[in-house]
């Protein structure tokens, strides 16, 4: 069976989720091609087409109305040719509110033959919004990043690599900060945490970097000066809130997770976060919003959740996470992730879905 995943898995992506999944599906015996260009020009040559983020179809740039019209034509052609379309629902709506991208989300959801939900909240949300839908609804969790990261690096080794004192409670907020509210959430919660020796590890909290700035001229110079000022103040605030690069290299990422005691998910309004299964797989205690699929997973695994709009709720959750970091909660998290989110298990679940749709097409 020939599978097309409409995603440019170049190996340099900020998010390696899809390329790892594709490798896992190939290991199950399927021919898998990851390409947006193939979706645009040769989708009819495949047995199954699998979409991830609709934004990927526009190369994460703002589409023109004609681009959305073309997408609908492509989706209609797939339907006319009887080629099953699968959509993995990572988000409810686009993060940045572009109405044309939101329209593309609606088209993909409407034309999909099967919708994969990464958690129960997504499934309930979608079926409530579309009670008459006859599409196949399937729940397949987010996989962990086996084979990409060294998950056996020790806490001491991670801290030595990053220059973090061994005796600190380290709170890690990982990934991009999408807006100022996420920065305020993390910084405020950390400052209010009643812990005598604490350290905030949030390498992308500060929006300026030493290299890789998109600005030019005076704006680039100002960005570098702001980066230098924040970098100089880190020792005073017991924190690491700057990064010289826009992205953390894959080979350094395990050091950050190994160094942490608690992983803080800073999203204020989101359906999914791959950082939750990632942190669980490294055996770290996690705290995050009690919403979307994140809230359900945290409750299932015994990790504290909070209401981002309620500072007291955030404080209680972070304090509880700090206490849990001294127990076997991290070990339980790791065992849970390995049992439920292993790439082999998740890839096999997708393989079963492909077979189900392919067999249905032939009947």
Question: Which residues does each predicted region cover?
Answer:
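Short hydrophobic beta-strand element within catalytic cores of glycosyltransferases
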Residues: 265, 285-288
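Conserved acidic donor-binding segment of nucleotide-sugar-dependent glycosyltransferases
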Residues: 299-312, 319-326
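Donor nucleotide-sugar binding/catalytic pocket of nucleotide-sugar-dependent glycosyltransferases
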Residues: 113-128, 132-150
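A short helix/loop element that forms part of the nucleotide-sugar donor recognition site in Leloir-type
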Residues: 149-164
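A charged, aromatic-enriched C-terminal amphipathic alpha-helix characteristic of glycosyltransferases
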Residues: 325-359
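Conserved donor-binding/catalytic core segment of Leloir-type glycosyltransferases
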Residues: 165-181, 190, 201
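Nucleotide-activated donor-binding/catalytic signature segment of Leloir-type glycosyltransferases, i.e.
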Residues: 212-255
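Short acidic/histidine- and often glycine-rich active-site loop of Leloir-type glycosyltransferases
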Residues: 278, 291-305
């Amino acid at each position: 069976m020939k599978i097309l995943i409409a995603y440019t898995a170049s190996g340099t992506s900020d998010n390696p989720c899809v390329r790892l999944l594709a490798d896992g599906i190939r290991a199950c015996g399927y021919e898998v091609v990851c390409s947006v260009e193939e979706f645009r020009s040769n989708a009819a040559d495949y047995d199954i087409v699998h979409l991830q983020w609709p934004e990927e179809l526009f190369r994460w740039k703002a589409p023109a109305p004609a681009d959305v019209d073309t997408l609908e034509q492509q989706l209609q052609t797939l339907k006319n040719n009887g080629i099953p379309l699968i959509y993995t629902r990572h988000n409810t709506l686009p993060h940045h509110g572009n109405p044309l991208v939101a329209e593309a989300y609606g088209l993909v959801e409407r034309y999909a033959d099967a919708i994969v939900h990464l958690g129960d909240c997504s499934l309930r949300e979608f079926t409530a919004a579309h009670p008459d839908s006859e599409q196949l609804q399937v729940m397949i969790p987010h996989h962990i990043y086996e084979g990409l990261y060294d998950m056996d690096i020790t806490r001491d080794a991670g801290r030595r690599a990053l220059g973090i004192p061994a005796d600190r409670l380290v709170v890690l907020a990982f990934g991009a900060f999408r807006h100022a509210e996420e920065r305020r959430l993390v910084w405020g919660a950390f400052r209010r945490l009643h812990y005598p020796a604490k350290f905030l590890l949030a390498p992308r909290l500060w929006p300026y970097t030493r290299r890789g700035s998109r600005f030019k001229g005076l704006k680039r110079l100002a960005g570098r000066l702001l980066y230098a000022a924040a970098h100089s103040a880190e020792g005073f605030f017991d924190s690491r809130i700057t990064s010289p690069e826009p992205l953390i290299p894959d080979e350094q990422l395990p050091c950050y997770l190994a160094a942490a005691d608690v992983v803080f998910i800073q999203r204020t309004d989101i359906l999914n976060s791959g950082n939750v299964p990632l942190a669980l797989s490294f055996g770290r205690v996690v705290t995050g919003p009690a919403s979307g699929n994140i809230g359900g997973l945290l409750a299932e695994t015994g990790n504290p959740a909070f209401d981002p709009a309620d500072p007291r709720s955030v404080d209680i959750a972070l304090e509880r996470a700090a206490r849990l970091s001294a127990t076997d909660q991290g070990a339980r998290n790791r065992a849970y992730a390995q049992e439920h989110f292993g790439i082999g298990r998740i890839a096999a679940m997708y393989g079963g879905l492909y077979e189900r749709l392919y067999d249905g097409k032939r009947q």
